[in-house]
């Protein structure tokens, strides 16, 4: 094996440099993940009748319901609006997390990293 490298790689790939790059990427990923966990994502349903705020930890922070949408005879509609807004807020958080991590990893698929 070539000194400081791997066979067939021309000796240009130094394992120490590779490890340093991996550690740096891991630190950057942890930083971005922490920032995303604190970020708030807002989604609404029913033309703004129900608004949900979630964070990057996938915690629902608040649910706002416009009073005029509350109909005791149609609770199911309100439940559907709340569910739709919650799901959209969490989906938006997931998508942004995936996009930010993709930027860091250069598009490498790293399952379980975020």
UniProtKB/Swiss-Prot annotation:
Homodimer. GO terms for cellular component: bacterial nucleoid; cytosol. The keyword Metal-binding does not apply. The keyword Cytoplasm applies. It comes from Clostridium novyi (strain NT). This is Nucleoid-associated protein NT01CX_0824. It is found in: Cytoplasm, Nucleoid. Its main location: cytoplasm. Binds to DNA and alters its conformation. May be involved in regulation of gene expression, nucleoid organization and DNA protection. InterPro entries: YbaB-like_sf, YbaB/EbfC.
């Amino acid at each position: 094996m070539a000194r400081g490298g791997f066979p067939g790689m021309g000796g240009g790939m130094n394992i120490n440099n590779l490890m340093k790059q991996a550690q740096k990427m891991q630190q950057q990923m942890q930083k971005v993940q922490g920032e995303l966990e604190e970020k708030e994502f807002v989604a609404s349903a029913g033309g703004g009748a129900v608004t949900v705020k979630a964070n990057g930890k996938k915690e629902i922070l608040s649910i706002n319901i416009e009073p005029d949408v509350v109909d005791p005879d149609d609770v199911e509609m309100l439940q559907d609006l709340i569910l739709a807004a919650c799901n959209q807020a969490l989906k938006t958080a997931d998508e942004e997390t995936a996009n930010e991590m993709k930027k860091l990893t250069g598009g490498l698929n790293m399952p379980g990293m975020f």
